[in-house]
């Protein structure tokens, strides 16, 4: 521990030696240059992002699948109307077209 303290004190005394202004300026400028060089963006090809030659195709939409429960429910409903006479008649009554001609009233332009 004492050796460590002695070396630190020696470094302080070395740093405290009076220097000429030119030497200090030169050392400061060299430190600044080193700092600037270490802060530069790397420009080598290893550090660059590679260019994309062709764009990938867009993702395709997946076809919608009806779940099995919906399929079975639909098929059961259809079988009911096909199997019974009452069911088929009921369906026909829903879609029977009765010819009731509805006359639309025309507006008169005279007011």
Swiss-Prot record:
Main subcellular localisation: nucleus
Molecular-function annotations in GO: protein kinase inhibitor activity
Biased composition (Basic and acidic residues): 10-35
Keywords: Cell cycle, Nucleus, Protein kinase inhibitor
Tissue and organ distribution: Expressed at low levels in roots and stems. Expressed in the root vascular tissue.
Knocked-out gene: effects: Larger leaves with an increased cell number.
Cystine pairs: none
Subcellular location(s) per record: Nucleus
Keyword Nucleus appears in the UniProt entry: yes
Superkingdom: Eukaryota
Biological process terms in GO annotation: regulation of DNA endoreduplication
InterPro entries: SMR
KW Iron (keyword) present: no
GO cellular component: nucleus
Region annotation (Disordered) ranges: 1-66
Task of the protein: Cyclin-dependent protein kinase (CDK) inhibitor that restricts cell proliferation and cooperates with SIM and SMR1 to promote endoreplication during leaf development.
Quaternary assembly: Interacts with CYCD2-1. Interacts with CDKB1-1.
Protein name as it appears in the record: Cyclin-dependent protein kinase inhibitor SMR2
């Amino acid at each position: 521990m004492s050796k460590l303290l002695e070396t630190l004190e020696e470094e302080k005394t070395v740093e405290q030696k009076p220097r000429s202004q030119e030497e200090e300026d030169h050392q400061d400028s060299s430190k600044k240059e080193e700092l600037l060089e270490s802060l530069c963006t790397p420009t080598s090809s290893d550090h660059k992002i590679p260019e994309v030659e062709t764009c990938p195709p867009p993702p395709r939409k997946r076809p919608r699948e009806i779940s099995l429960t919906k399929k079975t429910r639909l098929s059961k409903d259809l079988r009911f109307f096909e199997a019974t006479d009452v069911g088929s008649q009921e369906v026909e009554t829903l879609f029977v077209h009765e010819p009731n001609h509805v006359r639309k009233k025309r507006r008169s332009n005279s007011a």
